[in-house]
Swiss-Prot record:
Function: Tubulin is the major constituent of microtubules. The gamma chain is found at microtubule organizing centers (MTOC) such as the spindle poles or the centrosome, suggesting that it is involved in the minus-end nucleation of microtubule assembly. Required for oocyte activation and consequently for organization of the female meiotic spindle. Essential for centrosome organization and assembly of biastral mitotic spindles in embryos. Plays a role in stabilizing the augmin complex on the meiotic spindle.
UniProt organism field: Drosophila melanogaster
Name under which the protein is recorded: Tubulin gamma-2 chain
Expression across tissues: Expressed in nurse cells and oocytes of developing egg chambers.
Main location, first listed in the record: cytoplasm
Membrane-spanning intervals of the chain: none
Keywords: Cell cycle, Cell division, Cytoplasm, Cytoskeleton, GTP-binding, Meiosis, Microtubule, Mitosis, Nucleotide-binding
GO-annotated cellular components: centrosome; cytoplasm; gamma-tubulin ring complex; meiotic spindle; microtubule; nucleus; spindle
Length: 457
């Protein structure tokens, strides 16, 4: 029985990466931009109905809800060649169209005001599913709509559908650039609190690392949003391959997350992908790829889509790893590669659990040609991700100490009387950092926030 997934795209960034994701899915399943199955798409071994449903005339419609408080990005989607793909009733645009002004508080309170309309769409979409498994939410944590309204929707979703899984693809800001959003540290910490409390799994898409990969690995001097979003859509489509081309394991969202997330709070995942190749690279630069080569490269920090401390010199370690390997793969090669990785101690694992690298070998789309014999995506739970949260906390503390740029927050009802919500959010993220650090120790199974607090006291 297919387990359907509803995708929510929130804000400018969420809708842009969502758009690239659907373009990619259409390509992989042989669906034309207007939702009609291509004549050549006769394979029939894929599960389109996890992410699409069929209209009365049999054309495919994404199980997607597009939400924004300003119209530009959604208008671009609706005037693109893919405009007929979407269900127009699943598009929510704020009537005043003024956006959230990159302010989390504004996005959150606007979410509250329009919740009825938004959840009418979501309820209708959920009721139309035979066996809904969960929701995927695409957004950014730094702006106003994706972070603020995204946080509001996340809270309500987890209350309204407590038995359904919520996975997010969350874009973290580029730390190498000076942001034009001065309140970005506040937005990030407030959103991280909701991602910690309300999501079951968060795939971290770190703009710092994505830009670094585009420049260093793909040799693109100044990467455009489209090029970065292409990278993101590759990660999103590969991370859902086992759901769309099912095999005997990891063929639903719960199976996928259960192997990666052993304890509820440690649910922030990083990804790595290899081999990377840009559009401008020629066929001559294609090298030989083997299973061992791909699995070894996936463990290298430079192929990680997160700029966190993952090197073996640090105390940080892997909690779990799932490698999704595609192409010409002999299962015996997988076994040999795992043995080699273990012998050479190429991956440093937690001391309190099994050192397991799981490997999934889903089929590739027969409609998309790859230049490489073998390619792989790693989804990893790694304690080094806490360095990303520490960076966010340091930037937050710098602003909060001076109470800088808080006027726009105080205009919203949540912050009118006091700023407690900001401090609670900071404590939540700080506790998350402590838990990831505790996970590097052998006594982690006995760890609890209360014990940690009493030590500090």
């Amino acid at each position: 029985m297919p387990s359907e997934i509803i995708t929510l795209q929130l804000g400018q960034c969420g809708n842009q990466i969502g758009f690239e994701f659907w373009k990619r899915l259409c390509l992989e399943h042989g669906i034309s931009p207007d939702g009609v199955l291509e004549d050549f798409a006769t394979d029939g071994q894929d599960r389109k109905d996890v992410f699409f449903y069929q209209a009365d005339d049999n054309h495919y419609i994404p199980r997607a809800v597009l939400i924004d408080l300003e119209p530009r990005v959604i208008n671009n989607i609706m005037t693109s060649p893919y405009s007929k793909l979407y269900n127009q009733e699943n598009v929510f645009l704020s009537k005043h169209g003024g956006g959230a002004g990159n302010n989390w508080a504004s996005g959150f309170s606007q979410g509250e005001k329009v919740q009825e309309e938004v959840f009418d769409i979501l309820d209708r979409e959920a009721d139309g599913s035979d066996s809904l498994e969960g929701f995927v939410l695409c957004h950014s944590i730094a702006g106003g709509t994706g972070s603020g309204m995204g946080s509001y929707v996340l809270e309500r979703l987890s209350e309204r559908f407590p038995k359904k899984l919520i996975q997010t693809y969350s874009v973290f800001p580029n730390q190498d650039e000076i942001s034009d959003v001065v309140v970005q540290p506040y937005n990030s910490i407030l959103t991280l609190k909701r991602l910690t409390k309300c999501a079951d799994s968060v795939v971290v898409l770190d703009n710092t690392a994505l830009n670094r990969i585009a420049t260093e690995r793909l040799h693109i001097q100044t990467p455009t949003f489209t090029q970065i979003n292409n990278l993101v859509s590759t990660i999103m489509s590969l991370s859902t391959t086992t759901l769309r081309y099912p095999s005997y394991m990891n063929n639903n969202l719960i199976g996928l997350t259960a192997s990666l997330i052993p304890t509820p709070q440690l649910h922030f995942l990083m990804t790595g992908y290899t081999p990377l190749m840009s559009d401008c690279e020629t066929k001559t630069s294609v090298r030989k790829t083997t299973v061992l080569d791909v699995m070894r490269r996936l463990l290298q920090p430079k192929n990680m889509m997160v700029s966190a401390l993952t090197d073996k010199q640090s105390r940080q370690c892997f909690v779990s790893i799932l490698n999704i390997i595609q192409g010409e793969v002999d299962p015996s090669q997988v076994h040999k590669s795992l043995q080699r990785i273990r012998e050479r101690k190429l991956a440093n694992f937690i001391p309190w659990g099994p050192a397991s690298i799981q490997v999934a070998l889903p089929r590739s789309s027969p409609y998309v040609q790859s230049a490489h014999k073998v390619s792989g995506l790693m989804m990893a739970n790694h304690t080094g991700i806490s360095s990303l949260f520490k960076r966010a906390l340091a930037q937050y503390d710098k602003l909060r100490k001076r109470n800088a740029f808080l006027d726009n927050f105080r205009r919203e009802s949540m912050f009118q009387d006091d700023l407690t919500e900001l401090d609670i959010a900071r404590d939540t993220v700080d506790c998350l950092v402590q838990e990831y650090e505790a996970a590097t120790q052998i006594d982690y199974p006995q760890w609890s926030p209360a014990v940690e607090a009493s030590k500090a006291g």
